[in-house]
Amino acid sequence: MRNKKSLNMIYRLISVGLLSLCCTGAFAQGLSLKDCMEYALEKSAKLRIQTADVDDARLARRDAILNAFTPEINAGTYTYSKFGRNEDPETNTFSNTTSFTNAYQVSGGIMLFNGFEAVNNIKISKTSLMMGVEQEQKVKDEICLATMEAFCNVVYYSKLSEIVQSQVETLKEALRLARKQEELGQKGYADVLQTEADLADMQYKLILAQNKRADALISLQDLMFWEEDEELEINLATSEERYHLDELDSAEQCSQILDFALAHNPAVLIAKGKMDNAKLDLRTAKWKFAPNISLSGGVSSNYFTYPGLEGYVPQAFGDQLAANIGEYIQLSLSFPIYGKLQRHSNLRKKKNSYIRAEAEYDTALRQLRSEVERAIQDRDGTGSALFQAERREEMQEEVWNLNIKKFEQGLISAIDFRKASEDLLNAKAERLNAMLKWQLKRSVVKYYNGISYIDQF
């Protein structure tokens, strides 16, 4: 038995060790975008709060069902002793004998009709639960989108730093060549000085890019609630997809995306749920003018004796309880006549609430329609910009390679070489920015078409 426990302990230690190695390896190679999303969802305080709200909604639905279809049952007991002149519980006459009574009772009641309030409450609780689930999904989507944007910022400035670093190395080599050409009399001191200034300017841009990368990383860590001891490392191996103009959706496909979003988007479903609940509340308020019908009943019994009364022998406890059983059943009908106009005021308020909810639902539909159309337009616009940025980068690379050869041969000045370097840097940076924007906008369109952000990766 002891050996078996020892083996189990060894297996557990091995399992924990392997898990730690796997986690360490994952952190070492950097977290992917999906890893960052999953981590942010796991640590999000906002999501934990919403999950608790959904659990409250489930409890409210259960309570509404039980309140509508089950009675309320109570049981109780009490005991008392009477002194002096009081009513004799055995003969129902007055005497000066001290008595002791112990009573028991069980009662229950159920509302048979209260203007369909119980039924409407069940429907309201069901809709509220649906709204809570949709709100939870909306929070998840917002966290994933914010994480994606922050992740793209880190990727952009990380790769921009790499691009600028490459230009710095190129300018260092150009400066070395310019000094050598100065020694050979092929270039003047002004060209060398200009190359040194260009190198210093590029090194300054590198520092700016690195600082922005550090700031973007802090923002991503804060968004993810990063709690690890080591600094967050992300996987920069992003998709280098090229854009093709034939990827544009047709008008029919755009209409399908819009229709799907209007029918399934959490924001619209939540607004519709609020409108439906407001309508049910209005119905309940109208039925408040109807009578209420309730049914109740109960069973009671008691035991009594005369302590200190000489020669009195009380009946056995069980026999007394059986003999003294009393039962009742009550059917109650209540008509509302005057309640200080509270029912009328409540009805007006519920009407106003329904008007507001209906207007908010219409607003949500218009906003979503505008967001979807803008998302499709942004995706197509950034796609066209990416297509042009890729062509521009290719041309600038050819020009850059040609200018490097000219600079080595002393055919262009340091100023022309600097301009070519800046043009290439801008082309690469704008192509990288266009690619990340296009990927982000494309993900938003996919989201509106029913694919959650985290499932896209």
Which residue ranges define each predicted feature?
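Periplasmic alpha-helical coiled-coil/stalk elements that build and connect Gram-negative outer-membrane
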Residues: 2-4, 142-260, 378, 382, ...
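Short flexible linkers and secondary-structure junctions
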Residues: 29-153, 293, 297, 341-344, ...
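Acidic, low-complexity, intrinsically disordered peripheral segments
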Residues: 35, 223, 228, 430-457
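Sec/SRP-type N-terminal targeting helices
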Residues: 48-52, 65-66, 98, 112-140, ...
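Small/polar, glycine/serine/threonine/aspartate-rich low-complexity segments that form flexible
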Residues: 76-110, 239-249, 283, 296-335
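A short glycine-centered flexible hinge/capping loop motif at secondary-structure junctions
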Residues: 182-186, 407-411, 448
